[in-house]
């Protein structure tokens, strides 16, 4: 796991009420927020993200970055002193790209690594015209290209290890982006405020996040109002994941996905699990608990359309599950949707997908974005 501290680095500042949504909602949200940026403060306040701390002092803005995972409390925290805006960054994950994309700041990205399942039209354009360069793949970065792109910072993922030490030796500060480790959906999205701080676009970041937060909390309230008379026992049940190697890989009971299930008005079968990330459990144990669940959430990359028949081929026992028999398996295909890029900054759309499945009467006109029932 990466553990390093950035004490001080100054940039060169070189120029370079919910009804229905579609995938284009991202840009409508962005435009709506940016039209009202004057209503928002330039000061960043962190409300949900456990891995970010911002402190305004006379010498600049002190940002402390840590791993939100409670089990990672021993890791070294990263300290950044922001004294002026930066506009040249390298991203090494799709989620990092999405943080810039939702703010309309893709032009600040001068380098990317893997281009697999890249959805951003703007990033494809920048890669084609040379505004953004490919820096190689994890474990085999092209260090000459990295240095030539003159980045102010390189965002890295603490879950990946290959080649990052070599990047560090280039003398360019690395920043761990722990957004994916946050246990609250709004905590994941709030990492866009870090981008706002580094680029000097704090007002923009505050405005966009406020729109995301408003949509998420408004829908939460609608779900609560619609379901409070039903009682906990009347809520639909949901199981997650499927067999990976020798066990059943589920999302932990304290994960952001478990929080989404709860906010969408469902009971997560594995809610008593204390893990905040994914966990591999005994297949038979999860199967016994999940066989009668009303819904089943799974995801993965699949070329073409993934079907119930394809799922049953993985393990014939899947076909005996109630969610399978009732065609209530909710699947997100990473090869066909920009989940890895944008889901982390669109928690309101993830929530709406599940609300549409669990309580369709609340969102009768909603168009699904990420999770759709398998046929």
Regions found by a protein language model. Give the residues of each.
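Stable alpha-helical elements in mature extracytoplasmic
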Residues: 85, 96-99, 105, 142, ...
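Alpha-helical scaffolding within the catalytic cores
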Residues: 214, 218, 280-285, 312-318
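Bacterial Sec-exported substrate-binding components of ABC uptake systems
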Residues: 11-97, 204-239, 305, 312, ...
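Bacterial N-terminal signal peptides
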Residues: 1-7
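Extracytoplasmic substrate-binding proteins
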Residues: 131, 148, 152-247, 271-272, ...
């Amino acid at each position: 796991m990466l553990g390093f501290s950035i004490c001080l680095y100054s940039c060169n500042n070189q120029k370079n009420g919910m009804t229905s949504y579609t995938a284009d909602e991202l840009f409508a949200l962005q435009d709506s927020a940016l039209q009202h940026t004057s209503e928002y403060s330039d000061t960043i306040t962190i409300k949900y993200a456990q891995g970010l701390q911002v402190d305004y002092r006379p010498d600049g803005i002190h940002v402390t970055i840590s791993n939100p995972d409670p089990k990672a409390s021993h890791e070294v925290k990263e300290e950044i002193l922001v004294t002026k805006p930066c506009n040249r960054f390298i991203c090494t994950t799709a989620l990092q790209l999405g943080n810039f994309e939702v703010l309309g700041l893709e032009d600040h990205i001068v380098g990317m690594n893997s281009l697999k399942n890249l959805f951003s039209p703007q990033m494809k354009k920048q890669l084609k015209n040379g505004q953004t360069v490919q820096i190689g793949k994890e474990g085999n970065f092209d260090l000459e290209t990295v240095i030539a792109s003159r980045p102010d910072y390189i965002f890295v993922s603490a879950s990946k290890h290959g080649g990052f030490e070599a990047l560090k030796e280039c003398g360019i500060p690395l920043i761990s982006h722990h957004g994916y480790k946050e246990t609250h959906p709004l905590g994941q999205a709030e990492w866009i405020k870090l981008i706002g701080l580094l680029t000097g676009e704090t007002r923009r970041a505050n405005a966009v996040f406020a729109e995301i937060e408003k949509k998420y909390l408004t829908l939460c309230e609608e779900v609560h109002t619609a379901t409070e008379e039903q009682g906990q026992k009347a809520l639909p049940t949901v199981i997650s994941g499927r067999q990976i190697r020798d066990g059943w890989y589920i999302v932990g009971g304290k994960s952001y996905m478990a929080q989404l299930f709860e906010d969408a008005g469902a009971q997560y079968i594995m809610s008593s699990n204390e893990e905040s990330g994914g966990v591999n459990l005994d297949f038979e144990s999860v199967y016994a608990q999940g066989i009668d669940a009303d819904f089943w959430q799974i995801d993965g990359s699949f070329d073409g359309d993934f079907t119930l028949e394809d799922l049953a081929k993985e393990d014939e026992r899947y076909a005996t599950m109630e969610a399978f028999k009732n065609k209530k398996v909710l699947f997100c295909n990473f090869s066909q949707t920009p989940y890895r890029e944008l889901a982390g900054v669109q928690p309101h759309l993830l929530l709406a997908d599940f609300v549409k499945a669990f309580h369709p009467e609340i969102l009768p006109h909603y168009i699904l974005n990420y999770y759709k029932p398998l046929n």
